[in-house]
Amino acid sequence: MTDEATEETALLQDAPVAPLPLLRDYLLRLDSVSPDNLGQDDLLCCPQLSNQRARYASFSLLLLLLFREKKTRKKFSQNNTWDQWKQETQLEQWVQAIDQNIVRIWNGFLSEFCSAQDIEIILWTEFRIDGKGKPYRVIDFVTKHPDLLNDRVIELSLQNRWRRGPPLNSSNTRQYLTPRYDMLCTPWIYHAFDFGTQVAFLILLVLYVLDPPRPAFYSLPLESIGSREIILIVISISAILHSWPTSVPFALTLLAFIVKLPSTPLPSDFAFNLLLLSLALLLIQLYLPFPPNPFLLFRPDLSLPLAVLIVNRVFGTILKVVSFFLPILLLSVVFLSVALSDVFLLIDLAPAPMQTRELFLILAVSNFILMVLAVLVLVSTSTFSRETKSPWDRYSIAIGRRARIEFYNSVIQYSKPYPFPPPFNILYFVLISIPTYVLPHFDISTSFFFALQKNLWRIIVGPFVAVARLFTFNLP
């Protein structure tokens, strides 16, 4: 089997000559043993990789992580209580045995000297279950395993990759200019482009709602659409194509302009309210730990835990408290409305006694005060923990774990080679994504498009990356 390069293929230029082994047969062998026999060498070892220490360990770790994922996703039988309890007990035994072997293999790999490139290989090497399946990497499962998530070596490796990108192959004595040129686009730079585009969009949207177009009494179609409006529409489209988790404001902006074509949203239109809602959501998203965000630009280990703390302790707490008190609060408000009004639901009612009105007013105010007190109590509970070795855990272990997950997922998301950040991704969507999706249906090879993607990136995106890298060389 030969691995065809894709957009997810890493820039690590050290691929072995021999094809990498498949995982399918090894996973089937693990199903036939008990948890006590899981650590047998012949089950987890791949002789084909015996002379490649990093890939050998990567294969074994990925095999166990995939097997762990398979076991934990298995649904239990609900027919019999004893059967369900037995299955849960067996699952705990399996997970414990798998985790012990994962830690054993990882610590055994670290017990001997290994370079930064070795760590990259073990985390980012792609293996497939079968010849046509999607590739899997150890890094894809790090956030799902508690020991690997809190491992200091993995943390340092991902922080280094975030700032500098994947290392070049030190065994290759001939380093050409193009690999170094490609390496300029680190995950940090890629994210900075994303965040910069979002900030530019936010500024233009603020200018629009502060100074909307003022059409003349008689104007031609599309006359009020200027460069500002065109840029807002283009960035909205590119953000949606980019699949940002926080692309709702961009979709609202695009919808506002579409429904008003050939004119533009005006303060008297409902579409203008969509722009205001989009602006409010964008401002709120600046405080969320989801990329792109300002917390990933400088010292994520200090800023991301604070963002996660605020989201979990404040927004999460408010949502829980409101959900808890909402039924009684709604009833109190409804009863208060009935008591204060002589007409309710088109039914004439006699005025309620003053004592009744006072009671429902007291109930509504009391529920609101209880909600505020509950929020304050829950927010202040376990907000700060004792001093810890890692800055990620200075608020609490749970907050540190959640912050690491957000950071690691961001590193994975922005580690794609030859990326096309917005608005360049519109060009990528038209010239690369659509053909690679359509042509396989006609049995036409798409391998040419990976080379096209590289060349387009080097010509169009690369110069902007080089300039950005020059001005931010010492920042991250």
Predicted regions and their residues:
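Soluble extramembrane domains flanking the early transmembrane region of eukaryotic membrane proteins
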Residues: 1-179, 459-471
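Extended, intrinsically disordered cytoplasmic tails
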Residues: 1-2, 6, 10, 18, ...
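Charge-rich cytosolic interhelical loops and cytosolic tails of multi-pass membrane proteins
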Residues: 134-136, 283, 289, 293-299, ...
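Membrane-proximal N-terminal segments immediately preceding the first transmembrane helix
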Residues: 156-183, 198-215, 298-306, 344-349, ...
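Hydrophobic alpha-helical transmembrane segments corresponding to the first two to three helices
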Residues: 166-297
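Terminal single-pass membrane anchor helices
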Residues: 182-192, 196, 208-224, 243-246, ...
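Eukaryotic basic, amphipathic alpha-helical target segments in cytosolic regions
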Residues: 207, 211, 326, 339, ...
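Pore-domain transmembrane helices of cation channels
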Residues: 293-358, 362-375
